[in-house]
Amino acid sequence: MTFLIDKMYNILPPELWIKIVDYSGEINLLLVDTNFFELFNLVDAKIDVIEYIVRNNLTDILKYIVVLKTLKHPIINKNFVPTKSLNKLLIDNCEKRRLDIIQYLINIGADINSKKNRAVRLASERGYLEIVKYLVSQGADVRANKDYAVVWASRNGHLEVVKYLVSLGANIKVDDNFAVRWASRNGYIDVVKYLTSQDANIRADNNYAVRLASENGHIDVVKYLVSLGADIRADNNYAIRHASRGGHIEVVEYLVSLGANVKSCNDCAVKFASKNGHLGVVKYLASQGADVRSENDYAFRMASENGHLEVVVYLVRQGVNVRADNNYAVRMASENGYLEIVKFLVSQGANIRSKNDYAIQKASKNGHLEVVEHLVNQGANFKSDYDCAIKLASENGHLEVVKYLVSQDADIRVNNDYAIRWASRNGHIEVVKYLVSQGADIRADNDYAVRMASENGHLEVVKYLVNLGANVKAQNNYAVGWASRNGHIGVVKYLVSQGADVRSGNNCAAIMGF
């Protein structure tokens, strides 16, 4: 093969090969043989050659470049080895864990200290010990950027990297003992133990380590920190409050056994646990004296709002008021589409019509058809507040809810045909078509529907309305003016084809160049 390449090289004179490469921009040819490679001195390469070589994993060529650099070959003076590119490639290959490429890049001039020693920091952060050691051997500063390397190696649980960096003098106590705080937060017990053996302060930042280890459920770390004197009641019993929030029952039980106050911060622990659906924690806290009814039955209300049926049932059995805060629970369960909770609350006496039938209005707004149907069956007034339910369902594009409400005699034309005007404004073509089939007036409010559909770029709606007789020139050619202002060129062109005047009114279309 080498013979054939050499023969090919000799077919044409070098100056012709140079023209071929310059014209085509194709550098592959220059990478097949040393004869061709020499032409780099003469061609005007339009791409980053080193990046190309690294991206295509052409390690043999990198080796060859290293040899040329050692020999001080004239080609090395050619600017196809830009330092900026080398530095970027060095960092990229630290991330990819390519030690072989890293070595070649450094040998041909990459600066390991570029970007505040980003290479060694990144290798430490990722736990690539062999790369960290090599970079250090080449002069990397492991303490750059406030000991970033050891901090992030600790944060990510890379014990061997941490030990190595400490052996080189890295400061584990920098930034108020960030290393042990975040190793604790992330549950890396071996790193935590090592850092404390090196005199890290576990009580830094108001006992951050034990607080965050508790919050994230790392029971082994919590126990270890407590054995060293960490204060579990710091920051108003943060540890138990947030362990409860995360549903970490084992941590919660352990903290209570050590005297954590389950009622701190107005019974935040049980409120958080209820809000997030952690039934086991809720039951345990209640057994330890937590008040499930604090703050106007907050725990029950949040459990209902967030769809945690088992918690809701349990709290109701503990005597909470299902109608607290003007029936907040059933209103928010309806708004968020939690049908089973709605049914249960109704069975317990919740008033679905509170706050002017808020429940059915918001269920309609969010498209929760089954909830809407159930509420109607329970006597909700879907016509309250000027048929707000169907207006909101139409505005938000919930066709099946719209159809159901119409079947129950909702008025689609209320409020000057609000439903079709806002369905058009928001581009809900299927709702628009259905409302038209039910007798909605597309020209209501001075052709509001086509004007707003145009303004918001809903071409399909615009075409449909125009086909039904909507006036594209209404209100001094509002439609084309605002479609232009908002950059909806497809709508603009269509409106112009239908006779819209681009020079009327404030000349928006003309200003935009149409």
UniProtKB/Swiss-Prot annotation:
Protein's name according to its UniProt entry: Putative ankyrin repeat protein R863
Record-linked SMART domains: ANK (SM00248)
Superkingdom per UniProt: Viruses
Sorted UniProt keywords: ANK repeat, Repeat
Gene3D superfamilies associated with the record: Ankyrin repeat-containing domain (1.25.40.20)
Ranges of the ANK repeats in the UniProt entry: 45-74, 84-114, 115-144, 146-174, 176-204, 205-234, 236-264, 266-294, 295-324, 325-354, 356-384, 385-414, 415-444, 446-474, 476-504
Pfam families: Ank (PF00023), Ank_2 (PF12796), Ank_4 (PF13637)
Record SUPFAM superfamilies: Ankyrin repeat (SSF48403)
Keyword Cell cycle in annotation: no
Upper lineage: Viruses, Varidnaviria, Bamfordvirae, Nucleocytoviricota, Megaviricetes
